[in-house]
């Protein structure tokens, strides 16, 4: 599967907060790291403080954990 920057992808890592959610590929690292694909999402995860806008809206994934949306 050829994933490129800007592509819409669905997350297939079951333990991920964003499992089965669709995000946009922000960057792809070609240096050989374990999780080279950075995916950006519209919503943030649960790590933000209560009552404050915040949280994380990006995460790294392996290509095998993604499918085209």
UniProtKB/Swiss-Prot annotation:
Transmembrane segments: none
Primary localization class, coarse: membrane
Pfam families on file: PSI_PsaE (PF02427)
InterPro entries, per database record: Elect_transpt_acc-like_dom_sf, PSI_PsaE
A cellular component annotation (GO) from this entry: plasma membrane-derived thylakoid membrane
The keyword Transmembrane helix belongs to this UniProt entry's keyword annotation: no
Subcellular localization, as worded in the UniProt entry: Cellular thylakoid membrane
Coiled-coil ranges from the UniProt annotation: none
Key word Membrane present: yes
Entry keywords, A to Z: Membrane, Photosynthesis, Photosystem I, Thylakoid
Topology with respect to the bilayer: Peripheral membrane protein
Gene Ontology biological-process annotations: photosynthesis
Family to which the UniProt record says this protein belongs: Belongs to the PsaE family.
Function field: Stabilizes the interaction between PsaC and the PSI core, assists the docking of the ferredoxin to PSI and interacts with ferredoxin-NADP oxidoreductase.
Protein name in UniProt: Photosystem I reaction center subunit IV
Gene: psaE
